[in-house]
């Protein structure tokens, strides 16, 4: 953890508006150009040199903090503080990249060498009831993957209370909310996104454990296509179906995988237009629902096909395209 905490009056960011510490983007934060900040970069390097670790999960620094200090050894004053801190971070990321360290960063630092960042979310949303969280989760996935591919993102699964909301907002005890738990896993892994669990355990009964195993085995089986680029079919709004389609024309077997969701309390049947141009398929496609039902569809001149699908209440279906 770098940001969102106080180190000392001499090492923290000096707020240009007040001349005091505090009041940064996330209240308190150290300055990378302070003695502590310079030492932080050195300690990170020493740690990876000595341990051989190859993953760095870091929270901060966040972009934009300017420091009005004139006594920090790393920068002259306010005017160069932001620039210097960006470059110090960039140098550290490049150093880690050169050693093959995988970087999960707190912001959009991909051009500096980061490998993954959060999808974007509001912490207060994790206080909402589980059924609302499922919809918001799909909205976050849908919106984030306009700008990044699935492997670039991660998202929360709050197993225990985050900020509030009571029993309706949490997944614990997991065995009592196993369907919600499974669907949140399937939404993330089905989008090819890493799920980050906020809680003390991944399962609490043998049934819950088997559910986790089943989902992870499913992900591993289809990992190739699940990490492929994603086509947005319909954004979740809680009023009708929503979904997305992974596509990769270079895959030798499965060239597409779609997930369709039904937020309503009754089953729905919809005829959905599936765009298959980026699968590389030109004439006919084999659609397989959940490893079972197989259907052959013909593509039109725009490489699309209409598919009639029934989606269970408050649930989902998935199918592969070959």
Predicted regions and their residues:
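Short beta-strand segments at enzyme active-site cores
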Residues: 1, 56-58, 103-106
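Active-site-adjacent "subsite" loops/lids of carbohydrate-active enzymes
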Residues: 1-53, 124-130, 138-141
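Short acidic, glycine/serine/threonine-rich loops at helix termini
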Residues: 2-5, 11-14, 67-71, 115-118
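Active-site beta-loop-alpha junctions enriched in small/polar residues
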Residues: 3-5, 61-63, 108-110
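Active-site groove signature of glycoside hydrolases
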Residues: 41-74
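Glycine-rich tight-turn/loop motif centered on a GG-T
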Residues: 72-83
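Active-site-proximal substrate-binding groove within the catalytic cores of carbohydrate-active enzymes
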Residues: 88-294, 308-310
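C-terminal beta-strand-rich structural cap/linker in extracellular carbohydrate-active enzymes
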Residues: 298-322
């Amino acid at each position: 953890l770098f940001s969102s905490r106080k180190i000392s009056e001499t090492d923290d960011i000096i707020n240009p508006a007040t001349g005091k510490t505090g009041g940064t983007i996330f209240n308190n934060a150290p300055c990378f150009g302070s003695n502590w900040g310079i030492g932080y970069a050195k300690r990170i390097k020493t740690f990876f040199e000595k341990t051989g670790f190859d993953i760095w999960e870091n929270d901060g620094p966040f972009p934009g903090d300017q420091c009005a200090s004139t006594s920090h050894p790393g920068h002259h004053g306010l005017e160069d503080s932001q620039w210097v801190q960006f470059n110090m971070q960039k140098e550290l990321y490049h150093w880690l990249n050169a050693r093959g360290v995988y970087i999960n960063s707190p912001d959009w630092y991909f051009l500096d060498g980061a490998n993954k960042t959060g999808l974007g979310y509001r912490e207060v949303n994790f206080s909402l009831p589980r059924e609302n969280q499922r919809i918001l989760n799909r909205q976050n996935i849908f919106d984030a993957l306009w700008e990044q591919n699935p492997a670039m993102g991660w998202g929360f699964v709050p197993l225990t209370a985050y900020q509030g909301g009571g029993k309706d907002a949490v997944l614990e005890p997991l065995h009592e909310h196993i369907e919600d738990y499974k669907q949140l896993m399937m939404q993330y892994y089905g989008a090819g996104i890493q799920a980050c669990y906020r809680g003390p355990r991944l399962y609490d009964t043998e049934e819950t454990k088997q559910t986790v195993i089943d989902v992870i085995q499913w992900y591993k089986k289809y990992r190739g296509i699940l990490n492929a680029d994603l086509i947005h079919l319909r954004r979740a709004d809680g009023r009708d179906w929503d979904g997305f389609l992974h596509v990769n024309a270079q895959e030798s077997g499965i060239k597409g995988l779609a997930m369709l969701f039904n937020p309503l309390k009754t089953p729905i049947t919809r005829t959905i237009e599936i765009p298959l141009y980026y699968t590389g398929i030109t004439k006919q496609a084999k659609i397989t629902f959940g490893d079972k039902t197989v259907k052959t569809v013909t593509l039109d001149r725009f490489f699309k096909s209409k598919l009639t699908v029934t989606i269970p209440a408050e649930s989902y279906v998935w199918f592969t395209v070959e």
